Amino acid sequence: MTRRGLVGLDIDGTILLQDETLSPGVIEAVAEVRDAGYEVMLATGRSWMATRRYVEQLGLTADYAVCSNGAVTMRRDGDDWERWHVETFDPRTVLGLLGDRLPEARYMVELGS
């Protein structure tokens, strides 16, 4: 029986430098891990639009990518990708509580559309 494993990589501060270029040796290291029989995928806080280019640059063949801090899971569909799972919630309650306590703060909510 062949043993398989999964390696999940973050993007920011893990495979990328601050200038948004891949850290030296990342492409080669990912290829070595894949050649050793492991599946390599990305799991990141970034949106899919900001993640896809790194899936392509690294030549990843995994069928999934986890984006938006786990709120969106993308699944490969042939040569394209589809939203396989989207975790949503109504942010109004949380934003109301935060606004009461931190009225000068700014907040961002990512829309899955």
Predicted regions and their residues:
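Short, small/polar residue-rich loop motifs at catalytic or cofactor-binding pockets
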Residues: 2-4, 59-60
